[in-house]
Curated annotation (Swiss-Prot):
Belongs to the PAPS reductase family. CysD subfamily. Coiled coil: none annotated. Its EC number is 2.7.7.4. It catalyses: sulfate + ATP + H(+) = adenosine 5'-phosphosulfate + diphosphate. Sulfate-activating enzymes, NodP and NodQ, may be physically associated. It comes from Rhizobium sp. (strain BR816). NCBIfam families: CysD (TIGR02039), PRK05253.1 (NF003587), PRK12563.1 (NF009214). This is Sulfate adenylyltransferase subunit 2. It is an enzyme of class 2 (transferase). Proposed to provide activated sulfate for transfer to nod factor. Signal peptide: none annotated.
Amino acid sequence: MSLANLRRLEAEAIHVLREVVATFSNPVVLYSIGKDSSVLLHLAMKAFFPAKPPFPFLHVDTTWKFREMIAFRDRMARELGFNLLVHTNQDGVDQGIGPFTHGSNLHTHVMKTMALRQALETYGFDAALAGARRDEEKSRAKERMFSIRNAQHGWDPKRQRPEMWKTYNTRVGAGETMRVFPLSNWTEFDIWQYILQENIPIVPLYFAARRPVVRRDGMLIMVDDERMPIEPGEEVMDRMVRFRTLGCYPLTGAIDSEAATVPDILREMLTVRTSERLSRLIDTDEAGAMEKKKREGYF
């Protein structure tokens, strides 16, 4: 991939970031701490330099993220000085909702989707930017860069608007909001090339290291804390693994890998023919799981 292509993608994303600031009164960036969010954070810092980004960064904390993710989040906010908001669905916490006790579907709905809706309504955000890409998953592949949501934060594919010649329709009706995806046209390979080119810090979990994992539901699940029950017949193995995508640790599978640097990851990716989302259990709850979640208000 040429440097010119990366600069074109960068310019497009920065244009979208500035368009959102120019046309919405109270935007926010959804900061999930992953590699795409790290790229989006970097682009936001660039887009408005030397000023700080004129919007906050919202992390929806399910209380089940990898410990290294939370430490990285706090370090980035401290070092870069951006406005970090953290929201947790306290009702879900009080009810003891979790991936082991209630399953991935209910956990995701309560602790991610409902939590996000709560935060958007509490702060009155009218546009939420996120780092989703079209090459990740089929429902994301057909979503527009500016994706209108109804008053209940739901997505209706039939209401999508044409986007021609970088002319975006940013108007929303009463109660409606907009989800905006500046990285829509990036691929996973583009993301890693840009991380290398710009020397962007990312969570160490993306790099191969020896980690304690168990094989469950066909995936290698990392034992990140004492809350993870070890089922009969399971064995905790110390394996050289890394993560292509990051979410709640009980719902995110690792891959066997020796790739310990960004160039190593780029070389490894030349042999990969599957989406990183295949290692996220929430995408396989049922047929069309991601589209169903988006209709309910998910990212």
